[in-house]
Amino acid sequence: MRKIFTLLFCAASLATGLAQQESYFTNPVIHGDVADPSIIRIDQTYYITGTSSEWAPYYPVFTSTDLVNWQQTGHVFDEKPEWTKSSFWAPEWYQHKGKVYVYYTARKQSDNISCIGVAVADSPTGKFKDHGPVVEFGKEAIDAFILEDKGKLYISWKAYGLDNQPIELLA
């Protein structure tokens, strides 16, 4: 009887020790295609979105509390915004004054030129309201990045056809 008790005690101790070990992960932690990812942390939750190209719904949203275990919780847009045609690329999260913004690239229906639009919601999993294009520049404007410095907001982006020109600060 004592041998059985000792064996059960050792098995329980081993199981407890294994359960307390750190969990390891292997890449990718999100399976599938999440190109041009953007990640934001709000409170204790991380949110990631990425390029969806031509596939609807547009810009998938995944959530995680540990950066290892991710769940898809929705999309920025279920339907494409009216002004857009295609090429739904490079969404960029930004949080400001209690709102969540997504700056994104899409081609306009009117002239097939890519530009940067913005959508706003109360949370990354909320219903986003599209506000249309905010950057239309030259042949195309893509890949927005938002920066706040000393209370001022700046946006940077890539523009085609400017290969041999210096970086400019536009006001």
Task: Describe the residue ranges of each PLM region.
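Bacterial Sec-dependent N-terminal signal peptides
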Residues: 1-22
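Carbohydrate-active catalytic/glycan-binding domains of CAZyme proteins
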Residues: 18-171
